[in-house]
Amino acid sequence: MLFKRYINCPLCFERIKISDIGFKCENPGCKGKPAFFRPPNSISPLEKMGLKSAPKRYPHECGNFATARICPKCQQEIPTDVDELSDMSIAIIGAKESGKSHYVAMLIHWIRRMGMEFGWNLTAMNEVTIDRYDQEFWRPLFVKHESIRSTNLVRGAGQAAPLIYSLCIGRGLLSRRIMLVFFDAAGENLEDASNLWYINRYICNASGIICLLDPLQLSRVREVLASKYGESSLPEINKDTGLIINRVENLIRRHGNARGNRIDIPLAVAFSKMDFVRDAGENAAGVYDELFRETRHHGAFCEAEFKNIDGLMRAWVQEVDVSASILAQSENFEKNAFFGFSALGCNPKGNGERLDRDPRSFRVEDPFLWLLRQKGLIKAMKG
């Protein structure tokens, strides 16, 4: 039996040798140095070749066994069974006001809720993930009925930690466990040299990218909605919307992760706030009606529904994107698809802060299910 020899750290996204993973003593009475690494001569050749599993605990100088594991690169504590899971990191990128935090909140809520139907179980892999999701995502939306504050710019070690989950798909001998890592980054970070060192590794090593775009930034959509609701009801104009896919592409190419002319990381282009744009464009009503009907993704990925929505969204984008850049840029990714969703299902009141009720999302799951299908992790049905 062969064991994994390398993993991508779910916190700093560096590629690390499993045999180099360190340990941390959690004994409160320990007087030695808590974090330590195994002496090189204690690592057997069989382990280095992947013919023997790495230990899950190691004796510390204080006499206790250390079980907490730490990354040799960033020195942060990583999940204990990180080397036993297939890793799937999903980069969620979006321009300002595209609704990244609301999307992450409702996607995780949906994954949990659909466990029985899809035969999976989602488990947070560390306390940071449990606390972050509860305090920064769940409570604002479902307890306080407030919108979530915007994603902070990445500032080195000050950046909020990724949300790390174990997703067990299937049951018994045929079950498969994957490590899901969600990291939401602001699109403006991709142009800030001081931030790129952290984001680069994450995006370039991602298993899939969900690029969130705000349709209210498209000029033709704005014209219709401004005449109907007034300019003050719309978010501030942000030119990043038409550039973000191009920025992601350039970042990946700069770091040599593109094979050939097209990038092989699957790209899901997802437009948020689609409940707000029904009258914006000749194709908008058809898109709206399809998006807000009952989903056909019941326990599997429905190919027919995906193709229908993807085609409708492409036609709508072609109509409302005057620059014609979004469709063109997406073609630089070998696998790309278009989606529309609403994370909240309503428009926050009172300066965009208050919700009248619990959020009722529509279609937040579609990009995620498509990415799982690209990796062969869920079944597909034709209709």
What kind of region is each of these model predictions?
Residues 201, 207-383:
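Conserved GTP-binding G-domain of TRAFAC-class P-loop NTPases and closely related GTPase folds
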Residues 95:
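P-loop (Walker A) phosphate-binding loop of NTP-binding proteins
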Residues 1-85:
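Long, basic/Gly/Ser/Thr-rich N-terminal segments
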Residues 98-100:
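Conserved glycine(s) of the Walker
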Residues 157-209, 216-224:
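Switch II of P-loop NTPase G domains
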Residues 90-92:
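Hydrophobic anchor at the beta1->P-loop junction of P-loop NTPases
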Residues 82-83, 111-152:
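Flexible phosphate/Mg2+-sensing switch loops adjacent to catalytic phosphate-binding sites
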Residues 103-113:
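A conserved segment at the C-terminal end of the G1
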